[in-house]
Amino acid sequence: MKKLFKTAVLATAALALAATGSFAGDYPDRPIGVAVSYGAGGATDFQARIVTMVAGNEDILGQPIYILNKPGAGGRKGWNWFATEAPADGYTMSAYNIPHFIAQSIKGGVKYSADSFEPIANWGSDPAVVVVGKDSKFNTMQELIDHAKANPGKTTTSGAGLFVGHHIAALQIEKACECKLAYVPTKGGGAAAMKAVIGGEVLAGINNLSDAFRAREAGNVKILAVADLERNDFIKDVPTLKETGLDVDNSSVNFRGLMVPKGTPPEVIDKLAKQVPLMFSHARVAKRMKAGGSPMKIMNREEVQKMWADREVVLKELLKGL
């Protein structure tokens, strides 16, 4: 009897191992969805569609990737869904935004943390910029700050939501200038925040460089400063906030990439971690991203894991007491 039981256990284990091996070898055998926790037209949606455009190539994944927009509550709706309901089978990934989802998890009120997900690879590094409408009376960052100091809490400044990179930059600017802005989180993400600036609904905005670059190319906005350690190649004429006299670093820079839910099979993670960086570095992707003013920064899984951990430390200190 014991011999029969042992044989049955070994047979079951062998079948499970064979099934796992077969799954890893066949994966993916159907299209893969990528959830974007923002509406269509914003920087994350725009870039996600570009960086996944060659997924169907046989030397990449051999299956196309489609986008699932799940906007709402400043990204919370999409990431809550991804952490609690998305199947952990490799056929549903999500775009991540750092510092956004980590900052939200630090402040609470969400169902996820950095430990809820497994990073795959990073595609971009998109710094925050300060923008004003094309006809704004403000032409320099100093003029905007002077107005904020003279009118505490009345310098309306749009951003994509609470605790996104835009909000982090606003908090840093307030601390550096010892003044108070009126930060206005929009419901429609970066695209809505930019529309508020262009339409004159707010005096200024903090947005992604990629969105601002396209808006400036269209003649709709002026870019006053970039929240990074050095000037960006896409807007070399625009000074950093440090150059304007404000002690603001690059903590608000928005890193974007792909992740899967915790519990995804290791062999699937390994395959994605190998192939996704190749997808991001494809020549067609790089050309389209450059044309759209979207800075790229490709990082592998190990580099992203370190970046997540480092950013969490910085954000916990920055958000302390808020």
Predicted features along the sequence, with ranges:
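Mature extracytoplasmic/periplasmic domains
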Residues: 286-306
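N-terminal signal peptide c-region/cleavage motif recognized by signal peptidases
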Residues: 19-21
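N-terminal (or domain-start) structured segment
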Residues: 24-116, 154, 162, 175-204, ...
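A ligand-binding cleft/hinge motif common to bilobed small-molecule-binding domains
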Residues: 98-108, 167, 171-176, 203-238, ...
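Extracellular/periplasmic bilobal clamshell ligand-binding domains
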Residues: 300-322
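Bacterial N-terminal signal peptides that target proteins for export
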Residues: 1-9
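C-terminal lobe and pocket-closing loops
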Residues: 125, 211-280, 310-313
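Hinge/capping helix and adjacent helix->loop/strand transition within the periplasmic-binding protein
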Residues: 27, 59, 81-92, 104-192, ...
